[in-house]
């Protein structure tokens, strides 16, 4: 991973609460959650730049929606 750097992150109460919940639910540190989110975002962005489409699917209701990064 290389040399680590420190940064200050300003989040709203709602965003901080979401981060806390994700960390707790997944038994991860907040830093690990943010790192994972960055990796996921980069993966999605790279695939979309190649012209690929990302979908979420609800098999129970036979519904599918395209994920868009805005």
Whereabouts are the PLM-identified features?
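Short, positively charged interaction helices/loops
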Residues: 44-70
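Aromatic-enriched hydrophobic runs in primary sequence
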Residues: 22-24, 40, 44, 58
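Surface-exposed, Lys/Arg-rich phosphate-binding patches that contact polyanionic backbones
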Residues: 13-32
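Short acidic/polar alpha-helix capping motifs at helix-coil junctions
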Residues: 6-7, 18-19, 60-62
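Small-side-chain structural scaffolding
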Residues: 8, 23, 31-33, 37, ...
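Short, basic amphipathic alpha-helical segments that act as recognition/interaction helices
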Residues: 28-50
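Short Lys/Arg-rich basic patches
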Residues: 1-11, 65-69
């Amino acid at each position: 991973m290389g040399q680590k750097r420190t940064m200050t992150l300003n989040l709203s109460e709602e965003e901080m609460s979401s981060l806390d919940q994700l960390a707790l639910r997944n038994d991860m540190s907040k830093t690990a959650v943010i790192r994972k989110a960055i990796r996921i975002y980069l993966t999605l962005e790279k695939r979309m730049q190649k012209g690929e489409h990302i979908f979420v699917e609800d098999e129970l209701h036979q519904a599918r929606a395209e994920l868009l990064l805005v």
